């Protein structure tokens, strides 16, 4: 079997899984969790913001005085770590591709999957907190842990752990490094090999410092770059404010096939919007819970709510910023795609006399994609430790990730991306099946949280609240 045949097979399988199976299940899950949580993503938005504002400190009230200081990651650091993974090439290049292929209407469906999918993010992140365990230096958790402890299915948990390690630790990281190399070569003429070596060494330095260094790095870099990018989008929108009503009209009409002359159909818009929305905000995918579990909080729902806000931050702020930059520029039908379209759109939106699209996007891509590499690495580490907690194995994994980052920068990624789509779809289905079953615990915790809020308390959870799962919640005794 030659490479071309293998690429065709992989493309066909990934197409069926991502375009039909995963999209359908994601929508069903999003609606189901919205119903059983009674619209948590809408009715507790104010509480999400309040928690994020006060999330900079570590919350250790649920820890006994004689226990070591596990959970040295603040709620905000866990939020920044998850945003670091979410905000990457999908926000700049992925949105551009969605518009180029699915038309402006893809943005509408990206909003829909974010708004309703946020309920899935709440459930999975709350479960990650509930079933987290104590590691040597911090808490650890995620789907593999709640599948094992909540469902007692080790084979299922190990399957997920392998899939997320392959998808995030290797495949997605190679895509991120490839995008960085392309952007730096296009804008500054940096040889690809130089970028590859630089990323390889920088990745090793950061990931060898452990989760504390990873979280501190994300805590500093992610907010700065996100705010800078949003401000740029606002400047472009203000400079092209007369086009704003037209842009909103394009998005809505194209989303429902009323203006197919703009490109795409309702089916293409929906599929591209949902696919790119998932790749970007990761709601229901099973990746974010690995970051959510690291936070030290007094109640699992606190981190569930903060991670719900993360979906909004990623899609409704960052992705929407890219969309408006592209659509306000009026060049989305010029034949460009991916990161090149975003670069040209910034130039067009600001005007040629102050054009710096290539430069700014290259810098943004570097920071967004590199923080994604670091967060993706951590997701893999957490799941490798779940399978077999060995420092030697982790050190080998660190070296392999650095090698993959190097290789990703210098090789074609068509086949790798196809495999990544397949493993991403499978891990998403694994996770969604688990949270469909375990979601009842998140609902019980939510009721407990709201009850304490109404009583004027700062909610604190103890395992005795849910006696039937008390033996499996070792961090909440």
Located regions from the model:
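Extracellular/periplasmic helix-exit of transmembrane alpha-helices
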Residues: 122-131, 136, 232-250, 264, ...
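N-terminal alpha-helical transmembrane segments of multi-pass membrane transport
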Residues: 1-84, 89, 100-105, 406, ...
């Amino acid at each position: 079997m030659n490479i071309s045949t293998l690429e065709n097979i992989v493309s066909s399988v990934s197409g069926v899984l991502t375009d039909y199976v995963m999209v359908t299940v994601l929508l069903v899950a999003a609606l189901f969790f919205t119903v059983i949580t009674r619209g948590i993503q809408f009715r507790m938005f104010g509480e999400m913001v309040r928690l994020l504002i006060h999330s900079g400190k570590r919350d250790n009230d649920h820890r006994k005085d004689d226990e070591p200081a596990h959970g040295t990651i603040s709620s905000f650091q866990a939020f920044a770590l998850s945003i670091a993974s979410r905000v990457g090439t999908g926000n700049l290049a992925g949105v551009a591709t969605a518009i180029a292929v699915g038309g402006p209407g893809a943005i509408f469906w990206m909003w829909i999957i974010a708004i309703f999918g946020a309920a899935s993010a709440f459930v999975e992140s709350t479960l990650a907190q509930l079933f987290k365990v104590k590691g040597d230096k911090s808490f650890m958790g995620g789907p593999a842990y709640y599948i094992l402890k909540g469902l007692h299915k080790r084979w299922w948990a190990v399957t997920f752990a392998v899939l997320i390690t392959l998808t995030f630790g290797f495949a997605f990281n190679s895509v991120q490094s490839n995008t960085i190399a392309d952007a730096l070569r296009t804008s500054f003429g940096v040889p690809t090999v130089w970028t590859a070596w630089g990323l390889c060494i920088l990745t090793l330095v950061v990931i060898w410092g452990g989760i504390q260094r990873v979280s501190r790095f994300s805590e500093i870099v992610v907010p700065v770059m996100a705010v800078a990018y949003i401000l740029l989008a606002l400047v472009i929108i203000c400079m092209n404010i007369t086009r704003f009503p037209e842009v909103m009209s394009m998005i809505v009409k194209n989303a429902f096939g009323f203006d197919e002359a703009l490109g795409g159909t309702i089916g293409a818009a929906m599929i591209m919007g949902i696919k790119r929305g998932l790749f970007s905000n990761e709601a229901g995918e099973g990746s974010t819970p690995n970051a959510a579990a690291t936070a030290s909080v007094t109640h699992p729902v606190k981190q569930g709510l903060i991670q719900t806000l993360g979906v909004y931050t990623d899609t409704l702020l960052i992705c929407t910023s890219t969309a408006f930059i592209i659509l306000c520029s009026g060049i989305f039908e010029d034949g460009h795609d991916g990161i090149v379209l975003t670069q040209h759109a910034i130039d067009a939106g600001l005007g040629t006399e102050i054009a710096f699209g290539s430069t700014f996007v290259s810098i943004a891509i570097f920071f967004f994609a590199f923080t994604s590499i670091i967060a993706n690495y951590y997701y893999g580490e957490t799941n490798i430790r779940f399978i077999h907690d060995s420092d030697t194995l982790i050190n080998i994994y660190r070296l392999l990730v650095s090698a993959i980052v190097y290789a990703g920068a210098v090789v074609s990624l068509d086949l790798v991306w196809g495999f990544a789509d397949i493993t991403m779809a499978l891990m998403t289905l694994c996770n969604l099946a688990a949270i469909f079953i375990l979601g009842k615990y998140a609902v019980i915790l939510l009721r407990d949280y709201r009850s304490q809020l109404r009583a004027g308390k700062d909610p604190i959870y103890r395992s005795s609240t849910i006696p039937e799962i008390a033996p499996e919640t070792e961090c909440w005794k």
